[in-house]
């Protein structure tokens, strides 16, 4: 019997470490999804570098307590799955929010970002943001635009002076 308890303690520690080390976590209710839909969701999350697991709620409660995430208990009822990412803050929210739009059976319960609990609406909002790379490319294009426009203006002035010289 003590072997089972030890295994459960190790699982709780593993989940707590996962919660502590992740930059973004989304907790969902997957009731009503078919096996094919869950498989598709797992595939999309895997491609985005997100880990998706189903844990017992009691294990999640203990792990959340160990990880210092008070207030998560109220969301840990019914079928619960957890999507975590250690690299991209937006990835779990983006994939799950997009999947939830197509499949109404997937219900976003809550999320955790930077150690604080966020609502389902906030998860959807984060999911609508572009990825880090997308934001960087937007910033670069905004920074390049004035320089590019200046270069075009200088070129136009140079061409007009050449035409007037001829």
From Swiss-Prot:
One BP annotation, GO: translation
Gene3D superfamilies: 3.30.70.1730
PROSITE patterns in the cross-refs: RIBOSOMAL_L10 (PS01109)
Domain of life: Bacteria
RNA-binding found in the keyword field: yes
One MF annotation (Gene Ontology) recorded for this entry: structural constituent of ribosome
GO cellular component: large ribosomal subunit
Entry keywords, A to Z: Ribonucleoprotein, Ribosomal protein, RNA-binding, rRNA-binding
Record text on subunit structure and interactions: Part of the ribosomal stalk of the 50S ribosomal subunit. The N-terminus interacts with L11 and the large rRNA to form the base of the stalk. The C-terminus forms an elongated spine to which L12 dimers bind in a sequential fashion forming a multimeric L10(L12)X complex.
Family to which the UniProt record says this protein belongs: Belongs to the universal ribosomal protein uL10 family.
Job of this protein: Forms part of the ribosomal stalk, playing a central role in the interaction of the ribosome with GTP-bound translation factors.
Name recorded for this polypeptide: Large ribosomal subunit protein uL10
Source organism per UniProt: Staphylococcus carnosus (strain TM300)
């Amino acid at each position: 019997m003590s072997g089972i308890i030890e295994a459960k303690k190790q699982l709780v520690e593993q989940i707590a470490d996962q919660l502590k080390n992740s930059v973004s976590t989304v907790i969902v209710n997957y009731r009503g999804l078919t096996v094919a839909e869950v498989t598709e969701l797992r595939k999309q999350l895997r491609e985005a570098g997100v880990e998706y697991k189903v844990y017992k709620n009691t294990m999640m409660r203990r792990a959340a307590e160990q990880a210092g995430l008070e207030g998560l208990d109220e969301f840990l009822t019914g079928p619960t799955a957890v999507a975590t990412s250690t690299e991209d803050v937006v990835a779990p929210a983006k994939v799950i929010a997009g999947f939830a739009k197509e499949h109404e059976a997937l219900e976003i319960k809550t999320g955790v970002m930077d150690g604080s609990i966020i609502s389902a609406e906030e998860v959807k909002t984060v999911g609508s943001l572009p990825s880090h790379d997308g934001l960087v490319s937007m910033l670069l294009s905004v920074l390049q635009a004035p320089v590019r426009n200046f270069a075009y203006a200088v070129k136009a002035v140079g061409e007009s002076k050449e035409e007037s010289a001829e």
